[in-house]
């Protein structure tokens, strides 16, 4: 029997392999599929979602990876709307109430620059330096501004002083990527601000001019409603946790399209006589199959961490393609510790998002990077009689501490929460997950990593790289990276299809 028109169209569609089922890979697969391409996602682990992991247990709901995201990327809006997740979007209560530990005590962080200047959070000298920054740095010569290897701490200290670095920048980078301002490259960690200095000298003046420029208004599109503006500014999660996002994409993929426990062993790029483009052959292995399996594809999106990519065998037109040009990537280790305390045992419960701990606060006995007030943000995450906290330990600040045992981590977290929130006694519940490679560290020599990714893409036709090794570490950036790679694949396949028709 001849296949139906729909079946024939499906079988004749180009095939694309996506390696890795984290948020980047799943976003790429979703966009490719709605474009009509055949997609196969290979995931070495037994579950999809990457570092978006939500757990529901004994009336508690917590995230072991990212806890929130923002809608600053257009691709995030596209996916949420396409997947019908608006009704499941969950915004934290009092998310503008964020605290910074200072002298061993949590201090409410002013929610905007004007309130910061009016408050006592910073010294008079630091506030004066902030006020004078637009004047002192206006039209500075290029020789006096940041070079591509300058650290985050060096950049912000030049503009705003050491106190701002110690009590604003340091806790911020620790809380967002587990890094520290001395190890991070300004060029790669905050490219927008780095470019503003190049253009305007003053970061504050540049930010104001950039926001008010007609080009920026045009880029932002038509006027947004207040609800849309709130969505784009604020952090959010989903009912059930962040994994709700990746689960929704997985539901759209058939079992043969999402291959869990399927490890890619070899990739081979070759050009056949009857094809005008390079095709890809992928050999993968699964525990439930005795023999490895070989399949052909028209393009590949690679989202695996570079440390895993280096272990793959890749051939190009019959010859080994060595990946020895990929440098060693420095990764940040992190432990995520979940605790609950009876409400009556927390003497100073703070309403808000959470508290961050600057490095300097270690002199006051604080060892954690920060704590999210999970059940304060999302009351449905815990029963009414307990508080649920998510605490982060380790990072580049203290790599060894990230690897500590659960018993030691419990003592560290309990001690910090006692000092910061007045939590007394033992927690009623403790859990933790150790991420040995939580984030790639955008360090001073990260150019070599980006150059290696570019070289890999340039020398392997039809292969595109996506993920948080390039373009940003946030969930939104990683998701957008996957969507962008999908767009590049679509353009690539359309261009080679046009070229092949010209040769007919």
From Swiss-Prot:
Q: Which cofactor does it need?
A: FAD
Regulation (activators, inhibitors): Inhibited by the herbicide acifluorfen.
Q: Name one GO cellular component term.
A: mitochondrion
Function of the molecule = Catalyzes the 6-electron oxidation of protoporphyrinogen-IX to form protoporphyrin-IX.
The entry assigns this protein to a family as follows:
Belongs to the protoporphyrinogen/coproporphyrinogen oxidase family. Protoporphyrinogen oxidase subfamily.
Keywords, alphabetical: FAD, Flavoprotein, Heme biosynthesis, Mitochondrion, Oxidoreductase, Porphyrin biosynthesis
The species this protein belongs to is Nicotiana tabacum (Common tobacco)
Which EC numbers characterise this protein's activity in its record? Answer: 1.3.3.4
Where does this polypeptide localize?
Mitochondrion
Where do the annotations place FAD binding?
Answer: 20-25, 43-44, 51, 65-68, 264, 473-475
Q: What is this protein called?
A: Protoporphyrinogen oxidase, mitochondrial
Q: How is the cofactor bound?
A: Binds 1 FAD per subunit.
Catalysed reactions listed for this entry: protoporphyrinogen IX + 3 O2 = protoporphyrin IX + 3 H2O2
Q: Which domain of life is it from?
A: Eukaryota
Tell me the GO molecular function terms.
oxidoreductase activity; oxygen-dependent protoporphyrinogen oxidase activity
Q: Give the gene name.
A: PPXII
According to the UniProt record, where is the region Disordered?
213-232
Pathway this chain belongs to = Porphyrin-containing compound metabolism; protoporphyrin-IX biosynthesis; protoporphyrin-IX from protoporphyrinogen-IX: step 1/1
GO BP term, example: protoporphyrinogen IX biosynthetic process
What is the induction comment? Oscillating expression during diurnal growth. Maximal expression in the dark period.
Primary location recorded for the protein, binned into one broad class: mitochondrion
């Amino acid at each position: 029997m001849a296949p139906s028109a729909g079946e024939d169209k499906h079988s004749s569609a180009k095939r694309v392999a996506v390696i890795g089922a984290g948020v980047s890979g799943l976003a790429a697969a979703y966009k490719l599929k709605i474009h009509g391409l055949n997609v196969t996602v290979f995931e070495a682990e037994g579950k999809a979602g990457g570092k978006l992991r939500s757990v529901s247990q004994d009336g508690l709901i917590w995230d072991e990876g990212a806890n929130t995201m923002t809608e600053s990327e257009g691709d995030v809006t596209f996916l949420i709307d396409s997947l019908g997740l608006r009704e499941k979007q969950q915004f934290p209560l009092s998310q503008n109430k964020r605290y910074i530990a200072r002298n061993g005590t949590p201090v409410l962080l002013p929610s905007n620059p004007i309130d910061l200047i009016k408050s006592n959070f910073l010294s008079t000298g630091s506030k004066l330096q902030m006020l004078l920054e637009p004047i002192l740095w206006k039209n500075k010569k290029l020789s006096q501004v940041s070079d591509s290897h300058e650290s985050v701490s060096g950049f912000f200290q030049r503009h705003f002083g050491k106190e701002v670095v110690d009590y604003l920048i340091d806790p911020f980078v620790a809380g967002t990527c587990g890094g520290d301002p001395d190890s991070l490259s300004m060029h790669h960690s905050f490219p927008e601000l780095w470019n503003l200095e190049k253009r305007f000298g003053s970061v504050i003046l540049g930010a104001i001019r950039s926001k008010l420029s007609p080009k920026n208004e045009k880029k932002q599109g038509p006027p947004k409603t207040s609800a849309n503006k709130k969505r784009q500014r604020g952090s959010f999660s989903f009912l059930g946790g962040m994994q709700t996002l990746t689960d929704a994409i997985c539901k759209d993929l058939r079992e043969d399209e999402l291959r869990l426990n399927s490890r890619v062993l070899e990739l081979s790029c070759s050009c056949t006589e009857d094809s005008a483009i390079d095709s890809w052959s992928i050999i993968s292995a699964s525990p439930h199959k005795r023999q490895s399996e070989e399949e052909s594809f028209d393009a590949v999106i690679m989202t695996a961490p570079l440390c895993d990519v280096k272990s793959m065998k890749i051939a190009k037109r019959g010859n080994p393609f060595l990946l020895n040009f990929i440098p060693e990537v420095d990764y940040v280790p992190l432990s995520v510790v979940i605790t609950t305390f009876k409400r009556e045992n927390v003497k100073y419960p703070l309403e808000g998002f959470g508290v961050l701990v600057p490095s300097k606060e270690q002199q006051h006995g604080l060892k954690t990077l920060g704590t999210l007030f999970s059940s304060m943000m999302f009351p449905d995450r815990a029963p009414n009689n307990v508080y649920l906290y998510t605490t982060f330990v380790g990072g580049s600040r203290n790599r060894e501490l990230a690897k500590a045992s659960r018993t030691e981590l419990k003592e560290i977290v309990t001690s910090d929460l006692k000092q910061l929130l007045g939590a007394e006694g033992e927690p009623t519940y403790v859990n933790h997950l150790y991420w040995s490679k939580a984030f790639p560290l955008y360090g001073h020599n990260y150019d070599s990593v980006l150059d290696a990714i570019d070289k890999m893409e340039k020398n392997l036709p039809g292969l595109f790289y996506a993920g948080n090794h390039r373009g940003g570490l946030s969930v939104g950036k990683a998701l957008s990276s996957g969507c962008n790679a999908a767009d590049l694949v679509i353009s690539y396949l359309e261009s080679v299809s046009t070229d092949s028709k010209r040769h007919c």
